[in-house]
From Swiss-Prot:
A GO molecular function held by the record: tryptophan synthase activity
Entry-annotated residues carrying N6-(pyridoxal phosphate)lysine: 96
Gene name tied to this protein: trpB
Keywords: Amino-acid biosynthesis, Aromatic amino acid biosynthesis, Lyase, Pyridoxal phosphate, Tryptophan biosynthesis
Protein name: Tryptophan synthase beta chain
Annotated Gene Ontology cellular component terms: cytoplasm
Family label: Belongs to the TrpB family.
Summary of subunit composition and partner proteins: Tetramer of two alpha and two beta chains.
Pathway membership, UniProt: Amino-acid biosynthesis; L-tryptophan biosynthesis; L-tryptophan from chorismate: step 5/5
Length: 396
């Protein structure tokens, strides 16, 4: 049920909350690290020196700006004007490098020498290992064994880049479990280590920090659209949502623009009520996961349910607190896309436009099977990553 819109703010407050979601619920051993990060991150990332270094890396190393591509054949089929924000063309093949460049640059300025990361689909792990190689920092990546088996190409990339990939065999052996192990590592190594969370989840300031680094996506959309549509806003923004980083980046600059409707696609897996899904916003109840108060898939007695999605990057049982807040406020519409709908949408884009999307991004494209748009609607879809890593799944 949507809550009445009583407060026109979608940004984090000084205590790390988006409405009633967020905060920092952490072990005592991490208090000093988190407090130091909370105090330092804004002053560092808002400094002119940091901004210049960060944007130079985005341009020269990551290859930004990423193109805003008019998908004519896809538009003709669905009878609207569809633009694709090509995050798949960034260095490392996804939006993840926007965040890893920012966080690793930040961690160096804070005197850290070792980076740990969690990864599901492997894209955040590859992006972390890539930037660590660039900046000569040690890198350890935690990855569930289930995800290692289905994303082996990315594992090889991480190892080639010099990272140590540690298989996680607890729980469902996916993203949630990898995150648990990364947090344990950080508790054991608080002095020299920075934990680089890949999504808008975790304790404050991570959700805000990751959203800020990913906001380059919507900044570019705003500057690119006028050349194509003679206005700087679309009618709709569409993105997939697991933890919420690419979605946060896609909508960040438009949150207060009521001309722009926001539609986010979460993973329905084998069906919302099948017991095998990751549709957290549809099914979740308020709880605490990985240091944040948010919506979580839970059993009746409060145990976290194991999520499922064909996409390794979307099977997370929680959601970023910003997204929990804007969904409950009615600012975003959430649609659940199942495995088959995502696979069908991936094939459609591939055959019509010659672009093979990541399975995560395919969920966003699946919205066109669920919803009809008007002929003159301008729609921007964030293609968060490329599909190389998912070829074995597509072939099945």
């Amino acid at each position: 049920m949507k809550e009445k819109l009583t407060n026109n703010t979608f940004q984090v407050n000084e205590k790390g909350y988006y409405g009633k979601f967020g905060g920092a619920f952490i072990p005592e051993i991490l208090h000093e690290n988190i407090n130091r990060l909370q105090k330092a991150y804004k002053s560092i990332i808002e400094s002119q020196e940091f901004i210049e270094q960060y944007y130079k890396l985005l341009h020269d190393y990551a290859g930004r700006p990423s193109p805003l591509y008019f998908a004519k054949r896809l538009s003709d089929k669905h009878k609207c004007r569809i633009y694709i924000k090509r995050e798949d063309l960034n260095h490392t093949g996804s939006h993840k490098i926007n965040n890893t460049l920012g966080q690793i640059l930040l961690s160096r300025k804070m005197g850290k020498t070792r980076i740990i990361a969690e990864t599901g689909a492997g894209q955040h792990g590859v992006a972390s290992a890539t930037v660590c190689a660039l900046m000569d920092m040690k890198c350890v990546v935690y990855m569930g064994k289930t995800d290692i088996n289905r994303q082996n190409l990315n594992v090889r990339k991480m190892e080639m880049l010099g990272a140590t990939v540690i298989p996680v065999t607890s729980g469902n052996m996916t993203l949630k479990d990898a995150t648990n192990e990364a947090i344990r590592d950080w508790c054991s190594n608080p002095d020299d280590t920075h934990y680089i969370i890949g999504s808008t989840v975790g304790p404050h300031p991570y959700p805000d920090m990751v959203a800020r680094f990913q906001s380059i996506i919507s900044k570019e959309i705003k500057s690119q659209l006028p050349e194509k549509e003679n206005r700087n806003y679309p009618d709709y923004l569409i993105a997939c949502i697991g933890g919420g980083s690419n979605a946060a980046g896609t909508i960040y600059e438009y949150l207060y623009d009521n001309r722009v409707k926001i539609i986010l696609a979460e993973a329905a897996g084998q069906g919302i009520h099948s017991g095998h899904s990751a549709a957290t916003i549809h099914l979740g109840k308020i709880g605490i996961i990985h240091g944040s108060k948010t919506l979580i898939m839970q059993t009746s007695d409060g145990q976290i349910e194991e999520p499922y999605s064909i996409s390794a990057g979307l099977d997370y049982p929680g959601i970023g607190p910003m997204h929990a807040h804007i969904a409950k406020q009615g600012r975003s519409e959430i649609l659940a896309i199942d495995d088959n709908e995502a696979l069908s949408a991936a094939m459609e884009l591939t055959r019509l436009e010659g672009i093979i999307p990541a399975l995560e991004s395919a969920h966003a494209l699946g919205i066109f099977q669920k919803k009809q748009f008007k002929t003159n609607d301008v729609i921007v879809v964030c293609l968060s990553g490329r599909g190389d890593k998912d070829m074995e799944t597509y072939y099945k």
